[in-house]
Amino acid sequence: MVVGEVVVSLRGRDQNRLGVVVGTDDKYVYVCDGKHHRLGSPKRKNPRHVASLSVTLAEDERAGDAGLRRALARLRDLRKGGTIRVEAR
């Protein structure tokens, strides 16, 4: 797993929730979703308990909790068969 990779939780209280890998060490990956687990307190997960979606977020999309929430909401919509919302900046 690499930093910025989008994963889905397979086990635990956060099962089926999307998150972004914000760090790794020898035994664990650290996952944030911007709401339940913010950048300041990431969720420590066993790598066997998450599955990669083969999507990596750009650094500006994962710069803050609000950016994480927006990016994950777009991906959640795509997984449900929706379309990507385009936001004006």
Which stretches of residues belong to each language-model region?
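Short, charged beta-turn/beta-strand-edge "cap" motif at the junction between a beta-strand
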Residues: 12-15
